[in-house]
Amino acid sequence: MRRREFITLLGCAASLGPRVSQAQPAGKIPKIGVLWHAGSAEEEGPYFKALAEGFRDLGYVDGRNIILEHRFPNEMPERFKVMAAELVALKIDVLVSVGNGASYAKNATTTIPVVFMLIPDPVGAHLVSSLARPGGNVTGFTNFAAELVGKRLQFLREIIPGLSRIAQLVNPNVQASRLHLDVTRSAASEIGLSVQAFEARSVAELEPAFDAMAAASMQAVTVNPEGVPFQGRAIIGNLAISRRIALCAYSKETFESGALISYGASHSAICRHAPVYVDKILKGAKPSELPVQGPTKFEMFLNLKTAKSLGLTIQIGRAHV
């Protein structure tokens, strides 16, 4: 996509605090397991790259002073379970999980520290006791901030004349997807919008869901990470455009599929921060005492090409972060 076709507004990242004392035995090369959610490093794309950069930021080089064992379950529940067990059997020092893999990582071990990434509701998912004091062997980084939902809806209302009805794509099998629906409905009611849920449990169910939205005369649809299968990110933009529905996304990667607008936490930034907690744990910190970190960098994108195809005129001066 050409630069002039979208606008980017970026927030700032915050420090994650002081280091702790050395705890790894001298000369021991730490082994880190990484349980992804897609089927390959190529599919993970910017997230895979960001995690590697995060380790390099701290002086870790894979194969030299750290060993990274990657597993790619391709969003298959049975593969999540098997691969989490594989990593534990390797006697890793820390298990890093991405997205829905966190629950499988937690169930696989009660002794190996687990650092999760991109989990919207770690308390509701029973990963931690609280955000401030996680307890147990699990901590990590959430990608959810409730105030983002209201801002997305406000942006849509400013951009789309006469907006009154919004669809939300929901995966009923994922608890966090239902959480997003509840928060969206609450935020929408405060500004006079109604929200209708449309379900999709897999990539195959996405097209029928968008057909149902069009039949119901939905003007816009909001999506969240848990409501869209990872492999479905690349097609939802075209599904929305072809049905003349404005898509409001949550990340740069989803935006690039053709969404009208995206506003949310930078998932790449979260992946790049995760090694900081791995480093702290290797140096003696306990996961139970490391608070769950919220997002600190936010991104907004407006796609002028998509707006034109939908017959919308974007007044840049009216949009506020």
Q: Model-derived features: where do they sit?
A:
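Short hydrophobic alpha-helices and adjacent helix-cap/hinge residues
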Residues: 1-320
